[in-house]
């Protein structure tokens, strides 16, 4: 996995330029790379993204040194795992309305002990390649590295969500919020 380019830019005090997709297009990913974008964001809630499309987009984007983020169809662990296991390094969780929903969402994005993400066998876990994982110091160190490279954004899209904003912002693991 590559370092999360959005978080890297943030740490450097710079703005990351993110190219948004509502449909899968490897050609647009390549054009975004040549145009100087730092990352790709896939709208999996309103767009046309299968897990295979996300996998291919991650492969091409990472090859150009760009991270991929995605808004998942819903914030269930099922969808979050499908996207993260393919190499997505940032998740936007739609329709967050309460502190508990925000906590469950963050937990699904992070490996233990910070969260409850399960260990898959795809790009997001280096395909369980023991040699590659040993480059990070083993599975536990890789999980720590992955957690530190994860962008977790709660999307507030309702009056109850905005009414609970302070509580939502108190959730450990959230990187930020966005409106909708």
Show the residue positions of the predicted features:
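N-terminal amphipathic alpha-helix/helix-capping segment at the start of soluble metabolic enzymes
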Residues: 1-20, 134-148
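Short, acidic/polar
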Residues: 21-35, 74-82, 159-171
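Short, well-ordered coil/turn segments that N-cap beta-strands
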Residues: 12-17, 37-38, 62-68, 88-89, ...
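Glycine-rich, proline-tolerant flexible connector loops at the mouths of alpha/beta enzymes
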Residues: 28-56, 179
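Conserved, mostly hydrophobic/aromatic
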Residues: 19, 32, 43, 91, ...
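Alpha-helix-loop-beta-strand connector modules within alpha/beta enzyme cores
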Residues: 51-85, 109-115, 144-147
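Conserved anion-binding
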Residues: 78, 90-172
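Active-site mouth loops of central-metabolism enzymes
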Residues: 10-26, 69-73, 150-163
């Amino acid at each position: 996995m590559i370092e999360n380019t959005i978080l890297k830019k943030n740490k450097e005090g710079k703005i990351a330029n993110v190219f948004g997709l509502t449909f899968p297009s490897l050609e647009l990913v390549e054009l975004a790379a040549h145009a100087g974008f730092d990352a790709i964001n896939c709208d999996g809630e309103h767009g046309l993204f299968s897990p295979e499309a996300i996998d291919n987009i991650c492969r091409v984007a990472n090859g150009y040194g760009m991270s991929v983020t995605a808004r998942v169809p819903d914030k269930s662990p099922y969808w979050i795992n499908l996207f993260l296991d393919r190499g997505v390094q940032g998740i936007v969780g739609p329709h967050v309305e309460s502190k508990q929903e925000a906590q469950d969402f963050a937990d699904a994005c992070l490996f233990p002990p910070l969260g409850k993400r399960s260990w898959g066998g795809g790009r997001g876990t280096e395909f369980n390649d023991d040699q590659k994982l040993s480059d990070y110091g083993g599975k536990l160190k890789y999980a720590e590295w992955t957690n530190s490279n994860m962008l977790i954004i709660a999307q507030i899209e309702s009056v109850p969500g905005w009414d609970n904003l302070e509580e939502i912002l108190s959730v450990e693991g959230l990187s930020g919020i966005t409106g909708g």
